[in-house]
Amino acid sequence: MTRALRLLLVSGALSLGVQQAHAQTADTAHGPVPDSTMLTTAMVDAGRKIFHGRGTCSGCHGDKLQGGPVAPALTGRSWRHIDGSYSAIIDRVDNGLAGTLMVPHPGGIEESQVFLVASYVYAVSHGMAKP
């Protein structure tokens, strides 16, 4: 077997492996859910700004994520409709919750901002950041 053919076979096998790994981790229609261990201070800070700004999240969940008459608190480990995992928070911000005021992409936030808001909520609810 020639060297070129071996390289072609190896690169094809690697490409297939990457595609399969991606397919196994793709938890949303938009690609793989980032791992919560990869959260950075910059992501959390950006998410905080969106949560309290354009996302309008604090209008229902409160300035300190303490909840209110129409939305639950997001500060503890007790969750009303989800398990509090990073992927579940992403899904909720991305898809909303039918029959409630929680709409998909609150405040018209963009897809990339969904992950940032989820980073902030996850970090606060897991004691990694302050509201």
Language-model features: where?
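N-terminal export/targeting leaders of redox proteins
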Residues: 1-33, 37
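A generic secondary-structure boundary signal that marks alpha-helix termini
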Residues: 17, 56, 126-127
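Electrostatic cytochrome c docking/interface patches
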Residues: 25-52, 131
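Gly/Gly-Pro-rich "capping" loops immediately C-terminal to redox-active cysteine motifs
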Residues: 41, 48, 62-94
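The canonical Cys-X-X-Cys-His
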Residues: 47, 54-63, 117-121
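Residue-level recognition of specific faces of alpha-helices
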Residues: 53-59, 73, 101
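Axial heme c-ligation environment in periplasmic c-type cytochrome domains
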Residues: 68-77, 94-125, 129-131
